[in-house]
Amino acid sequence: MKWEVVIGIEVHVQLNTASKIFSGASTAFGAEPNTQASAVELALPGVLPVLNRAVVDKAIRLGLALDANINQKNVFARKNYFYPDLPKGYQISQMDLPIVEHGKLKILVGDQEKVIGVTRAHMEEDAGKSLHEDFQGLSGIDLNRAGTPLLEVVSEPDMRSVDEALAYVKALYTLVTWLGICDGNMQEGSFRMDVNVSVRPEGQKEFGTRREIKNLNSFRFLEQAAKYEIQWQIDTLEDGGKVQQATVLFDPDTGETRMMRSKEDAHDYRYFPDPDLLPVRISDEQVARIKGEMPELPGAMQARFVDAYGVSAYDAALLTSSLAQAQYFEAVAKASGQGKLAANWINGEIAARLNRDGKDILDCPISAERLSGLIARIADNTLSSKLAKQVFDALWDSELSADAIIERDGLKQVSDVGAIEKMVEEAIAANPKAVEEFRAGKEKALNALAGQVMKASKGKANPAQVQDILRQKLS
């Protein structure tokens, strides 16, 4: 039997406000336990929450970027459950009237575009954290994280493969960091993913029973967890078993998911409007102000890069994986006048070297100005591709310009026709067998002769000119 995968994803986006959603306590990461928990987070009697308006602005910003409806009246609700890191006994969230509804996000899988529906994005507070490793036989509670503002972004179950799920979360990650509403630090919990997975026989309309994989904090873990869960569900069904709705956790050490608890539905949390918080009213003027402050969005910039610089849609998507990378590319492309070459070097050598060194484009040791200098010398045939890589290595490890490195190391490409002709004639005279083979129709023999010329020139001869002159001499 053939199976179809159905995936929906909930992402908890931690907003980068200086203070918490309902108090003035700091949201800074890494402080000593319980040093950043105010009376609101501690749930002391008589203390009332006060909404941080910056949270609302950031939520509107995301809603606009998702081309979603911004609800002009939205309501906070209490989500009731007991857990030691939640002193109030409820979490302040949104249920029936969230701030953002009915959005969409375009993804690219290979060369195929797809639009994923975004059901809603709602504001809520984060819970505290349980500490198990610091106490023998006991657990500690750290409430520093409690009250940190979150946007929970809920997708439609529109994804049909792990590749689509990865493309969606990466596109959302790019968007929230691009908009400046989230710092994107996944190690610190700024972007946490819950993945709902089900399978059904191909052609069946009804969804299968889903299981939710909780708290994934890396794209690699999402890929591993989803692949394992899909295969587990298929194996269970093909063996005659039933998939029970449940919440599961992913164990990176074993690469497997394991049962956490049977899955609750919304009614289990007994949502009701929070009586301590008035409904949030959003005016047209507020939305217009935020819209006017929005940067050019990744999708629009991708289309512009394709039109203005002639890069492929795939390259444009890579170049806009972050705002900093997009700005770096555009600076190089404008300075050098070579959009395609700039894209090739940034998506190729620059990306590989940054990945090797564990760096981000913001930490790139080659400035846009210095890279554009290298690209200009490739474009005007001063450098061959081989020599360009030598110059690139020197650029990475120094602060010199491409021209200074070329001058210092004598790396200028030889394009003088007379000089190349002399080397070609010497190669032809020294390799009569290769000449005979080429004239007999063996194209590879020409490459062997070209290699001899390049060797004689110490890699500095213009490869295209070498090939042209060889063909002229041997025709």
From Swiss-Prot:
GO terms for molecular function: asparaginyl-tRNA synthase (glutamine-hydrolyzing) activity; ATP binding; glutaminyl-tRNA synthase (glutamine-hydrolyzing) activity. Keywords: ATP-binding, Ligase, Nucleotide-binding, Protein biosynthesis. Its EC number is 6.3.5.-. It catalyses: L-glutamyl-tRNA(Gln) + L-glutamine + ATP + H2O = L-glutaminyl-tRNA(Gln) + L-glutamate + ADP + phosphate + H(+); L-aspartyl-tRNA(Asn) + L-glutamine + ATP + H2O = L-asparaginyl-tRNA(Asn) + L-glutamate + ADP + phosphate + 2 H(+). The keyword Nucleotide-binding applies. Pfam families: GatB_N (PF02934), GatB_Yqey (PF02637). GO terms for biological process: glutaminyl-tRNAGln biosynthesis via transamidation; translation. PANTHER family: GLUTAMYL-TRNA GLN AMIDOTRANSFERASE SUBUNIT B MITOCHONDRIAL AND PROKARYOTIC PET112-RELATED, GLUTAMYL-TRNA(GLN) AMIDOTRANSFERASE SUBUNIT B, MITOCHONDRIAL. Allows the formation of correctly charged Asn-tRNA(Asn) or Gln-tRNA(Gln) through the transamidation of misacylated Asp-tRNA(Asn) or Glu-tRNA(Gln) in organisms which lack either or both of asparaginyl-tRNA or glutaminyl-tRNA synthetases. The reaction takes place in the presence of glutamine and ATP through an activated phospho-Asp-tRNA(Asn) or phospho-Glu-tRNA(Gln). Heterotrimer of A, B and C subunits. Belongs to the GatB/GatE family. GatB subfamily. HAMAP family: GatB (MF_00121). This is Aspartyl/glutamyl-tRNA(Asn/Gln) amidotransferase subunit B. It comes from Chromobacterium violaceum (strain ATCC 12472 / DSM 30191 / JCM 1249 / CCUG 213 / NBRC 12614 / NCIMB 9131 / NCTC 9757 / MK). The gene is gatB.
